[in-house]
């Protein structure tokens, strides 16, 4: 036994955790701290080095703890503790799970109805409308949950990540979720990773989940937050430093004395928005604030177990980080990020100058607080303290104001404790416990579509047109306290640290910094019961999908590779600049088709900018000579038997975990995506669906390709891990051809997915062999 193992063995508790449930809602599913401990002990026999916290959790979930691991290189086979899915992505995941022919999920799994509720009139009215128009989907998900042994959170329950934090997250756990902001659970010391539905199906089927061993970025926090600064400002500053792709392939691990000054939900906020820097996930070490939160949410037994296991819930001394960032919270001022990208950071003291310099609209039209990022009790309390100051001076918000509680528990508690009343009095409209405007589910009517305007949110993402489908809406992201202050002022250049407001009598006054309890002194009010527990016996339940439905469609397997090179693929579109999953598969009004692959494919790449003409959703059909919508042209190529390819820029597929952005191109005849670089989740999703995700060996080759060229990929029979591919480009404009090289990151197993036509096809074929 090496010295590290000996040292750690001395502090191990002999206590058994096998009687402690992972969640009060799942009494028969137990913590496996002993199993993690045993695997780490075996892992250390082969790796005599200090480990980061992220490494401890990940390596403690390895299928084979004797695996030799090299960060950024080795593909790990892992066994997560649980799966969480939101209703928009769950539809396709459940349809895929059904086609696998398995009786029940192998790990605890939950479905959360939060994405399909459109914000319009207010919470109760919007919820009733959603229940009516989405009844078919909700019934499908509810029945599927009963049949396959999954927990089901009904519409109105709240946002998936808040529900997970309140009920399921635990220190040292490993979870995957079909939403990019799954890392929210890192606020409770959990490695929680956003994935596509096909990855979720693997885990639900009991198949090891594959993840390339991430690099580790350390963020050392010192000092403590003061005044108007909040946990949100930590991640806004980190995003400003690392940019939207700076965390790609890495886990962001926070540590240092400054951690102790952050609430558990504040740490969750920071981890949540790690998705905006492309990080695999983010997390914090186990500490007293996590214990406080676990105790307040009815999980004292987990807090006690974690305390006995804490040697594996913090990094080893002298653990190595691939990159180190240091932030002094004493001097961190509030940040406002945006517009159009979450990594364009502005210290509050300089923001007004940026607004003036860039000619952004200074008048604030709407302020929106809440979302999965900032809808905790503390967030609502601090925002209400700002609103109360305005009310005390006889004024209300000059801009429109919306409030989204993160869960039914938060809604009921702030209603009981008075924060909701204060926020409503200042002019706020309380929306349903759901995602709403954060994901584009917002029926906005205060400005005409296309009008240049500014909004500010406490959300996480502010891509062009994301919130309201208006490409001229300048969306800025800040803490809920700052959003509330600016909404009262009606001006995005207002700085509450220095500027004055005018009371009802015309007197000037300045807002004092926000205050608010981290947790309710009287405990949480659970509110209405919106939970459907897993059924103990669902074998006799039938899940029916109407063949005439416009919302749901059973999946047909994709065709396997025909063992031939991909010759003369037509470039469907050469994408110019940023191309997020919102550009590839828009949300908003399209969310209702998330369970119907053919219908939702009509939104494929309609937001991407065509480099040939600078327009969105306008590409030249090379056979008809006519300009048409991208999906229409793709369907025509497929009908003609012509394979096609997409050419893109940097960080292609940035944003959400939606696998529809990979399913749609596959469904409409796409064979490969060739770009300068990929966002992690999207690249994996493409592999899962049998599409070749390729990157230029020489990024400047992007400029050599035109939107009307044809591309051949040769030598596919020799496709192997780490081996470059040769592409032949036939230039339509020049009448010549040239050769370029492309890289890929597929390992041997992923190459088998390509050959089988998809990962699901491969799973089914392997299962058939065993039977």
Swiss-Prot record:
InterPro entries listed in its UniProt record: Acnase/IPM_dHydase_lsu_aba_1/3 (IPR015931), Acoase/IPM_deHydtase_lsu_aba (IPR001030), Aconitase/3IPM_dehydase_swvl (IPR015928), Aconitase/IPM_isomerase (IPR050926), Aconitase_4Fe-4S_BS (IPR018136), Aconitase_4Fe-4S_dom (IPR036008), Aconitase_dom2 (IPR015932), Aconitase_mito-like (IPR006248)
Cofactor binding note: Binds 1 [4Fe-4S] cluster per subunit.
Enzyme class: lyase
Protein location: Mitochondrion
Protein residues bound to [4Fe-4S] cluster: 372, 435, 438
Pfam families per record: Aconitase, Aconitase_C
Amino-acid positions noted as binding substrate in the UniProt annotation, renumbered to this chain: 86, 179-181, 461, 466, 594, 657-658
Disulfide bond annotation, renumbered to this chain: none
Membrane-spanning intervals of the chain: none
Chief place where the protein resides: mitochondrion
One example GO MF annotation: aconitate hydratase activity
GO cellular component: cytosol; extracellular matrix; mitochondrion
Keywords: 4Fe-4S, Iron, Iron-sulfur, Lyase, Metal-binding, Mitochondrion, Transit peptide, Tricarboxylic acid cycle
Recorded catalytic activity of this chain's protein: citrate = D-threo-isocitrate
Pathway where this protein functions: Carbohydrate metabolism; tricarboxylic acid cycle; isocitrate from oxaloacetate: step 2/2
PANTHER family on file: ACONITATE HYDRATASE B, ACONITATE HYDRATASE, MITOCHONDRIAL
Assigned protein family: Belongs to the aconitase/IPM isomerase family.
Subunit structure: Monomer.
Full protein name: Probable aconitate hydratase, mitochondrial
Organism: Dictyostelium discoideum (Social amoeba)
Gene name, Swiss-Prot/TrEMBL: aco2
